[in-house]
Curated annotation (Swiss-Prot):
Belongs to the NAD(P)-dependent epimerase/dehydratase family. dTDP-glucose dehydratase subfamily. The keyword Ribonucleoprotein does not apply. The active site is at 157 (proton acceptor). Pfam families: Epimerase. Keywords: Lyase, NAD. GO terms for molecular function: lyase activity. SUPFAM superfamilies: NAD(P)-binding Rossmann-fold domains. The keyword NAD applies. This is Uncharacterized protein MJ1055. InterPro entries: Epimerase_deHydtase, NAD(P)-bd_dom_sf. Substrate binds at residue 132.
Length: 326
């Protein structure tokens, strides 16, 4: 590994946690600085659990800060040795962006600007940052390719992620910073986000509560298991590109009703389903074209939806005593 001092934003988040843990498990001479504001968008108990696991590593340094606060960011990091930034921190969630749009501008716009500007001022040569499949909006052409138009987002969250890509190009063009954007497709797995459908489904099924099934179940998602996403991020870190955007998905869309059937099977309990109309800001289908990622990164997802959900459900059952209280 070329980089020895990596800053991971959102390190107590779902993807940030798994990436940080993988890096420290596999590279003894590598140090991770993790930053996170540990906000309460979802129950912070889960973020604390992830963070406590990471704090057990000697080569992990955690700093609680809000990277949308420029002065706080600089004050805490100006003296740290950093040679790569993996920017995963963000205000997540499509539906929540309809309720609290200001949170997205603050974190995803101002926060990302601050991270990019920090890289410029402190001579950090490369930033790998999280984008999202939501930038494809309501595009009807499938699968979604990096060359497709992405100028018609249908949620504020999506618009902020597209804005991040545009800012990244500016910082590459003006200052020569290497910028690699990764469009994640519905990431799932252990220690995932409680606001995500699969997590809510598992929790409510075990509690005997109804699960909400949008668009009457007529939806498909390109669910991507966390270990495949971490593999894609690692490849983006190691490969030497000046500016690129890549899809990181599974390229095998799963029908929502089959997805629910699998969770029922692995939890050994039937769901009580409440069928609802399509939600504002949602899309019918996501489907990643991985030809570019495979060609340039060598990225090939390995975990099937059956295997991934089995792992998640087993983990959930083993930890249900505290997970059901979230």
């Amino acid at each position: 590994m070329k980089y020895k001092n990596i800053l991971v934003t959102g390190s107590a988040g779902f993807i940030g946690f798994h990436l940080s843990k993988y890096l420290m498990d596999n590279y003894e001479d590598l140090k991770v600085i993790g930053i996170d504001n540990l906000n309460n968008y979802y129950n912070p108990v889960l973020k604390e659990k992830r963070n406590e696991i990471l704090k057990n590593y000697e080569n992990y340094t955690f700093i609680k800060l809000d990277f949308s606060d420029w002065d706080d960011l600089v004050e805490n990091l100006k003296d740290k040795e950093i040679d790569l930034i993996v920017h995963l921190g963000a205000q997540a969630g499509v539906r929540y962006s309809l309720q609290n749009p200001w949170a997205y501008i603050k974190s995803n716009e101002m926060g990302t600007l601050n991270i990019f500007e920090f890289a410029r001022r402190f001579d950090i040569e490369k930033v790998v940052y999280a984008s999202s499949s939501s930038v494809y909006g309501g595009n009807r052409k499938i699968p979604f390719s990096e060359d497709d138009r992405v100028d018609k987002p249908i949620s504020l969250y999506a618009s902020t992620k597209r804005s991040n890509e545009l800012m990244a190009h500016v910082y590459h063009h003006l200052y020569g910073i290497k910028m690699i954007g990764l469009r994640f497709f519905t990431v799932y797995g252990e220690y995932g986000r409680p606001d995500m459908a699969y997590f809510k489904f598992a929790k409510n099924i075990l509690l005997g509560k109804e699960i909400e099934v949008y668009n009457y179940g007529n939806m498909e998602r390109d669910f991507t298991y966390i270990s495949d996403v971490v593999d894609g991020i690692l490849r983006a870190i190691k490969k030497d590109f000046d500016y690129e955007i890549f899809n990181l998905g599974n390229s095998k869309p799963v029908k929502l009703m089959y997805f629910i059937e699998l969770i029922e099977k692995y939890l050994n309990k039937k769901a009580k389903k409440k069928f609802l109309p399509m939600q504002d800001g949602d899309v019918l289908r996501t489907y990643a074209d991985l030809s570019k990622s495979e060609k340039l990164l060598g990225y090939k997802p390995k975990v099937t939806i059956e295997e991934g959900l089995k792992r998640f459900c087993n983990w959930f059952l083993e930890n249900k005593d505290w997970l059901l209280r979230l």
